[in-house]
Every structure is written in C-alpha cells, then in structure tokens.
Amino acid sequence: MVARAAFPKGCLAMRVRDALGPLFDDEIFRSAFGVRGRPGVAPGRLALVSVLQFAENLTDRQAAHAVRARIDWKYLLGLELTDPGFDFTVLTGFRDRLLAHGLEEKILDLLLARLNELELVSGRGRQRTDSTHILAAVRDLNRLEFVGETLRAALEAVAVAAPEWLASWMPGGWQEQYGARVDSYRLPSDESERTQLTWRIAADGYQFLEAAVGVSAPAWLPQVSAVGILRTVWLQQFQRTITDGVQEVAWRGKDELPPSRARITSPYDPDSRNAVKRGSAWDGYKVHITETCDAKETGQPHLITHVVTTDATVGDPVVVDEIHDQLDAKGLLPGEHLMDAGYISAELLLTAPSQRDVRVIGPVRPMTRRTVQATGYDKASFSIDWDARRAICPAGAHSRYWTEGLDNNQRSAIRIRFATETCAPCPSRGQCTNSTRYGRQLTVRPQDQDAVLERVRAEQTTEEWKAVYAIRSGVEGTIHQAVTAAGTRRTRYTGLRKTALAHVLTATAVNLLRLDAWWTGQPLAPTRTSHLAALDLAA
C-alpha cells in the first residue's frame, strides 16, 4: 500500500514485480552457498539487486543503500519497510560465488525462461548480432610506464605476501624508486635519461625475479600472480644476453614481440588485450550482443537473448558457433540471423542452414580491390574449370598453377596463377594485374564455398535482401542503450570472467528496461535526422 501511494502510476521495479513475479529462485544458486554458518541474504534477491544495480548504473554502495532506502526496490524484493538491508560487500561476494561455481549465465537464462513462458520471447524468429569494444578498467600506459608499473605491482604484492623477506632483501633506493605509481608526469623528459631509466628498470626486474626463486625466498613466492605477470612481461618486452658475466638488455623489436592475442597490456588486468579496428586502438575486450528483432511480425519487444565476451583480439567469426550453440540450448535458436560482414564466412553460410536450419543474412565482402573500384577484371571475369583444376581469363588463356592450402586466417583456399609468359604480351594486362614480374593470381574457396559466396553476392544486390538486412542496424541502438544506461563502454572489473558476468547483468538489465518501455507503451525512438537533412529542397 505504501509503494502504491508513493508511485500511483507505478515504476519499473513495481511493474517487474507485478508482471513477472519472483524472478530468481534461491534454489538455482544453492550450489554456490554453504549449508553451515549464519543465514545469509537470499541469493535470488542478490541476483535481482545486481540486475537493478546495472539498470541504474549504480556502485555496490549505492545499490546496497537503495535496498535500505527505496520503497520501490523493497516492493520488488519483497522486503518489509523496516528491513535494514545488507552491507555492500555482500554483492562482491555474491559475484565471486557465481564465478566460482559457473553460474554467471543463470541470471539472464532465468529471465529468458520466464519470458518464454509468457510468450514474450521464442525461438525460430529473427535475431541480430553485433559487437562493440570494451575498455579495460585500467589506465593506458606507454611502454616505459608499463614495465615500470609491472615491476612496482609485483613489489606491492610481495610486500603484502612476504613483507619480512622483501624488507631484508630489497636493495636501497627501491622504496623511493617504486613507492609511487609510475607516471609520465614523473618520468624524465630527456631521451637519454629515459633510456637509462628503462635499462635500470629492466635490470631491477631481472634481479628481483632471480631473487624470487633464490634459496632465501619463500618457496611459494613464484606462484604469486603479480610475480608471474612480471616474469611474462619481461619475457615479452625485453631480450637479455650475458657475455663474460656482463648483462646486456634491449627492447624487443616490433617483429620480435608476441602477437597481440598473447601480449599482456596491464599488470592489473592480465586478460586485457590490445586490438585495432578501423584505425581505432583499445586495450580491453569485446562483447557480442544478440537480440530479437521481429517486433513488427510478433508485436513483442526487442530483447537480448545472449551475450558473449572475448578479449579484444578475437575475431567476430569465431564466436558465431558458440552463439548458435547457446541459443539452441535455451530453445531460442533463430530462423533468420542478421549479422554484418565481419561475422560472415563461406563456412558459416554453408553449415548454418544445413546443420542448424538457420538462415544467416549478411553481406559478403567484395572479391578483390578491382571489384570495389569497378575497374579491370575481377574474379567474376574469370571462369573456373573445377574438374580440370584451372581458370580461364577473359582473353581465353588458361592458368598454369593450382595450389590448395590455407589462407592467412587458416581457412581452406585455392591459389591460382597464370604463367608470366602468358600475361606479359596480353594487351589487357593493365586491366588485370599490377605485377610486372608475375602473371595474374586468383584466390578462390573450394567449389561448394565458392558457389555459396557467388549466390549471396548476387542476392545482396536485390532490393528484397537489402530491406531485410536493413533491420540489422537496429542492434546498434541496443549497444547504445547498454553503454549509456549501464556504462558498458568501460568495464567495472578486471579479468575476462568478471567482465563477462557484468555483461550478463547488463543484458538482463537492458531487457527489464525494454520490457518496462513496452508495458508503458513507449514507442521505439526513430532514427535521428538533422533539421538540415529533413528540409524538403524540392518545395
């Protein structure tokens, strides 16, 4: 009665309780809690608080305060007005328990199961997927800052784990050198001084790593996480040679560094990776969001059905099978799945319809640069004789070389090359190849894959295909809502698994926001159009 008096028109929390009832059963989370000790806070309530926390982009302290102070939250949680709530650290412990027992997906799954019962979400419809970058919860560091901060982080960790050993071993001056965080503001500006500082930090790091495995050090010291990170970073960033007892240290060159997928970018988040996409670089992760998009046909709201979180270097095509597997397990596998070109591959176009009865809709990339520029002879200008294993050019010449193997992405590919003496005298050579030493080269997929690529390239030029694919762009609005409402752009936590849990909570929160808008008749926002673009110049 008090909540009704305070919110006569209702609010999100009250409408969720009225429409969905108790969402999260305590029994689902039972394995994450012990059977002895003091009674704890009901895990179902903690799950609901965690979702509301992300729906309103609150900190743990703010969420715990809302449980104590807000009538609408008490209504949703089924608490008495006099309930004192709980300490904010309980939320941290709850997330840790979810991760420790592999229950991080359950919160979104339980909501989807309830919505499935209410026929608000179902499989075999149309869904769409897109990804966005996630910034790690660490500051950006240049190379010198990075190695200095990595050594400082290791010393900080050992100062807590083995203070007596570190105090007895640590050389003089290290407290002043590594006591404060490494920052460009405090680093020397002179290049020669920066170089000397780099070699000093490198030498100090090697000295510490040798001492950590020495006789006087605790046997377990190398197992400290920060010490292991220091060892890995020094291996990745430096190369050391010892000649006649003299140690020489140098940076690893660009070609000597490990690939981005293996290279640590921060001592405080070893799962974070660096990636570059369309000229934009970031350290962190990537999240793939899948949502329903058949509202016009069903009258149902657009709801997120699955999220996948990876490090920043994982390519989009890699996650498609996982998305389909998880959606199938939930009974939410779509009949049509819209994706951008980054996800599309010949293998996917072949296997998704045959193995899962899913029609994947997305553009296939142009075959060659000449296709994009619409000049010269592209691959479509050549005919392929699969039985004779050769290609025939527009002038009627036959290729000489046919090599089967893998492309740079480890996918099956066939490389076809024309002989130099065949192409050299050809009057159309300038329209065919820029090479002055070799004949024209083609790279094609195996016959079945090549056929499906040609079919899709023809389909994507039709107005019908374009109208269906245009629906895909709406998922970018979902990403925008997750970023603005829940602060998804920068992760709150360090580590891949904690970040993935945050994205599950975000997806669940966005679904509640979407449901509330649907219940209250709030229409979808139209595409933004500037006043200038909207002018009718013909008037």
List PLM regions with ranges.
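A short secondary-structure junction motif
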Residues: L23-E27, R70, K74, A485
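Basic, low-complexity segments
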Residues: M1-V35
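Basic, low-complexity intrinsically disordered segments
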Residues: S31-G123
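Short secondary-structure boundary/capping segments within folded domains
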Residues: A5, K9, R38-V41, R278-G279
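Anion-binding and metal-coordination hotspots
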Residues: Q62, D83-P84, T92-A539
